[in-house]
Amino acid sequence: MATNGHFAPIGSDSSDKTTYEHGVQVIDENKEFNTNLTKYLTFENVTPAGFNYHLISVFGSQSTGKSTLLNHLFGTHFSVMAETERRQTTKGIWLSKNKNGDGKSMADNILVMDVEGTDGRERGEDQDFERKSALFALATSEVLIVNIWEHQVGLYQGANMGLLKTVFEVNLQLFLKDKNTTHRSLLFFVIRDFVGTTPLKALQKTLMEDMSRLWDSISKPPGLERSTVHDYFDFQFYGLPHKSYQPEKFVEETKKLSLRFREGQKNATLNAQNGEFSEGGVFLPEYHRRIPADGFSVYAEGIWDQIVNNKDLDLPTQQELLAQFRCDEILREVMVAFDEAIFPFEDKQSQASRLGEPEVLGGLGAAMRSARAKATKNFETEASRYHKGVYQRKRAELEGKVDTRLKALFQGQLNAAHKSGINDFSDAVTAEVKAGQKKGTGYDFAEIVNDEVKKALQKYEEVARATVVEGAPWSNYQQELALYEKELSEVSARLRRDEMRRLATRVERWVQSRLGESVGLEFNALGSGRAGGAAPESGEKPSEKKFWDRVWNLFVETVLDAERRFTDRASSFDASLEEVDVGLWRLRRKSWGVLRAKIEEEMTEGNLLLKLRENFEDKFRYDEAGVPRIWRPTDDIEGIYTRARESTLTLIPLLSRFRLAETSAPPPLDRWVGHTPSSATTADEEDLPPIGGVDEEEGKSLEEEMTILGDAKRQELTIRFKKAADGVYVEAKRSAIGGMTQVPLYFYGILLALGWNEIVAVLRNPAYFFLLFVCAVGAYVTYQLNLWGPILKMTEAASNQAMIEGKRRLREFLETSDTGRQAIAMSSSGSSRSGNEHEMSRLNKQGKSSTDEDVDDL
């Protein structure tokens, strides 16, 4: 007996291809299914064939030459029985691929199953395996070859009529489970040892009569009582000569028979009931079980599991389970390739999100489109062969998984483009504004914003279009584009507000500078009481009475000028009327704050007291023509002092309250500032200081807002001013009294009498006279040039330097000469006896010691 060499039996885990060279054991004699069937199909390159494969099973009694027939027909190497023995050879079910196919004469990928023979003594009465193997073969095979000898035709047991009856019953069982599909199969009777004495037609007729009887004998479900065997089975017949007696003819006929195993088409003109049977290709489309090759192993295992556990065989359910299993496998495989393509982008996007730095990923759109197309195409190619309902459901699941991740990437890309676009837009506008400011030629803010908005939208749409996945329902960015445009508008408005704030700040600084200068000049003018001869006798000049009028007019004119500047510049920002109104309202409030701060600065106690004193001194020390007064005892010092003091004192109540001379009331600040614009926001108001009489919540009236000095301050300021004025008056009084001390006239007569000789000597001597004349001219020129002060200082400095130099030389002389050293020694010995002696080095120019000088300073 030849054994199944290079066949993979049950329990073999070898991955060596040589183990599967001749085939694989599908089911062993113990009803165990071989899970390595997939490996064999992979090694034989059947797995990727899809539906392009065919499965044949052979039935027959034990030791009737089934394996021999298959080996000659398909070039397989199934074990055959030795001619010297009569025993079981094939145990279980074995499978091998056709080795004779050349791609032309036979169909591709023919798989042949050698089923254990029936009626064997090894199993005896146990027919359970026969029934289960028949059911398995019928559920999986397109063609069932029934191998019988010619002399067995007409017998019941010898012709395997019992097994065929089982096949018919099983087929009806399968039909009841799936009434939508007619499971049609071909029963191919190969009559062995055919000698031709009985014509093949007669044998066909006998067998068909037996088939009809068997069919009629089985119990049928309601509705199928009138059905015939031809409704579910097709039949073909072929006779083969005796292998031992006619070996050459046997080989020749098997070659002819092998040519029948190709794809064919049903011939509708043949009537099987009249004994007309096809002699063409045996593989008709309706025979195929429509199980893809890559799922056959799983399907066969599921079928056998139900059969071996005596469960009702439900092929539709098994097909759905197979489709579920294979579609899940294919989906996982497809997702692995999808992950490889997409995960790097997901990782980059996730990292950028964690870092808070949005990044537009280059090449994302192409990768997404390619990954999605490949995933759906690969899944469709592999899974579309399976159960349509399961396939469509799993395809939807795949698309859902793929689209969920791609949608997240798409949204992330749009978000990154959104955020980076907003940042770039803001930076670009800021940079353009700064560039315009540096050039100093001015810039059109609205034009800058419009240009940058166009660039930002164009860039965003480029990114979005590049990321779009055609056919994906989520791949529409119009809503995101609208949100992007909206935020660009909001950012533009914010940048415009910021720019207007900066403009307002610049205008406010300009107002502050102008008001600081002009109002400062008005306050400085208060320090001068000189007005020329036109000054009235009372000293109350109109200019002082209208001081606040001038300040208010200056303030209003300055702010109006600033408002014109602000309005002209804001027009280039494309600002709305509401924004301009808010800006002008803020400018007026800020300007009032600037004026009030300047007034408070000028009205500090020290500054105001100084201005009052200067005002008083100008009125007191200068006459009506502005000429300085030289006080004489005959002058009315008290009257002038009183008038100047009272005139200056009138400034204190004048300055204490901001009132207009024309109306004797505070300026209309509330009307001038105006009401808060309706478009003003909280942010517009939060940095504005409250104004009394304008802001109700401030709780201050306009009168209180215009009060510069309180009563206590006025009283204190009046007292201090009077004290300062009294000091000036006392000084003037002393000056007038000091002028009364004069040299007696007789002194000049005595001086003339006693110095007459010297005067005559000088006048008579030309040299003396000329020297006197030169000295007089020099003294006059020095006086006119006001050089007596510098000359005296230079003289004093020269004398001090001469004194220091003299002391130094004297010290050197005393230290270097013998006499000097003796004198120093004597001075040192006597210093303890006299505390009044001093070192010369400690004498100053007045001859005092430094100690005496320190006492004088105290």
Curated annotation (Swiss-Prot):
Membrane topology label: Multi-pass membrane protein
Topology feature Cytoplasmic, residues: 1-742, 788-858
The keyword Nucleotide-binding belongs to this UniProt entry's keyword annotation: yes
Domain GB1/RHD3-type G: start-end pairs: 50-300
Keywords, sorted A to Z: Coiled coil, Endoplasmic reticulum, GTP-binding, Hydrolase, Membrane, Nucleotide-binding, Transmembrane, Transmembrane helix
GO biological process terms, semicolon-separated: endoplasmic reticulum membrane fusion
Superkingdom of origin: Eukaryota
GO molecular function: GTP binding; GTPase activity
Comp. bias regions, Acidic residues: 683-697
Primary location recorded for the protein, binned into one broad class: endoplasmic reticulum
Region (Disordered): 669-697, 821-858
Positions in the Lumenal compartment: 764-766
Endoplasmic reticulum recorded as keyword: yes
Top-level enzyme category: hydrolase
Cellular component aspect of the GO annotation: endoplasmic reticulum; endoplasmic reticulum membrane
Compartments reported by the entry: Endoplasmic reticulum membrane
Binding site for GTP: G60, S61, Q62, S63, T64, G65, K66, S67
Spans through the membrane: 743-763, 767-787
HAMAP family found in the cross-reference section: Sey1
Family as reported in the entry's similarity comment: Belongs to the TRAFAC class dynamin-like GTPase superfamily. GB1/RHD3 GTPase family. RHD3 subfamily.
Record function comment: Cooperates with the reticulon proteins and tubule-shaping DP1 family proteins to generate and maintain the structure of the tubular endoplasmic reticulum network. Has GTPase activity, which is required for its function in ER organization.
Entry protein name: Protein sey1
Organism this protein belongs to: Emericella nidulans (strain FGSC A4 / ATCC 38163 / CBS 112.46 / NRRL 194 / M139) (Aspergillus nidulans)
Top-level taxonomy: Eukaryota, Fungi, Dikarya, Ascomycota, Pezizomycotina
Gene name of this polypeptide: sey1
